Regions:
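PRPP-associated nucleotide enzymes
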Residues: 1-216
Length: 216
């Protein structure tokens, strides 16, 4: 009897960071599956996988970033569409790989009548059929709790520390605000470097504008 081997690992990428996906595929020794993404004249996105993913372990890679003429929202929606396609194609398990997780800064209500969009995004992924999420250095660890499925929260710290060590011995690690002090402390400890903290406040009613108050 002839044995038929079926491909179990399917690595699929959206368009926001295709070079990264290609490097991952090369490192794993696998080929990127083709989602055949296309845009209609009205901007809607369509995809259809070139190969069967039935019973397979599907990883869908997409950074939620603005690139290649895409907005963050475009990147997110494109990934959701691919997740839905994989689920409807009977994939056994679907893992979304989000090197940069969109809307991560909106992880709480800082004022009344605001959304918690990082939680909303997690809800959308779960509703689409995601079984697991992988991300790198989330804005805050609490985002892991927004998912009802497992989250692998990776860190690029070892890679960055190795690079920083090539910059010299007289280093100072600066935390841009009090919220990142613990992270800065970890880097300073690994590098045996000094630590500085910037105390700042945001200018009310002005987007992306801050005032630096003190450096400690």
């Amino acid at each position: 009897m002839e044995l038929i081997t079926k491909k179990r690992l399917h690595l699929i990428s959206g368009r926001s960071n295709l070079p990264l996906a290609k490097e991952i595929a090369e490192h794993l020794g696998v080929e990127l599956a083709q989602p055949n993404l296309a845009e209609f004249a009205n901007g809607e996105v369509h995809c259809r996988f070139s190969e069967s993913v039935r019973g397979g372990d599907v990883f869908i890679i997409q950074s939620h970033s603005a690139s290649e003429g895409m907005t963050i929202n475009d990147s997110i929606m494109e990934q959701l569409i691919m997740v839905d396609a994989a689920r409807r194609a009977s994939a056994k398990r679907i893992t979304v790989v989000c090197p940069f997780y969109g809307y991560a800064r909106q992880d709480r209500k800082s004022e009344g009548r605001e959304p918690i969009t990082a939680r909303l995004l997690a809800t959308l992924f779960i509703a689409a059929g995601v079984n697991r999420m992988i991300s790198v250095d989330l804005h805050s660890g609490q985002i892991q709790g927004f998912f009802e499925k497992p989250v692998d929260h990776l860190t690029a710290m070892p890679v960055l520390v190795d690079y920083m060590r090539t910059l010299g011995d007289d280093l100072v690690v600066i935390s841009p605000d009090t919220g990142r002090v613990k992270v800065a402390e970890r880097y300073a400890s690994e590098l045996a470097a000094d630590l500085a903290i910037v105390h700042k406040r945001r200018v009310k009613n002005k987007k992306n504008v801050v005032e630096s108050k003190d450096v400690m």
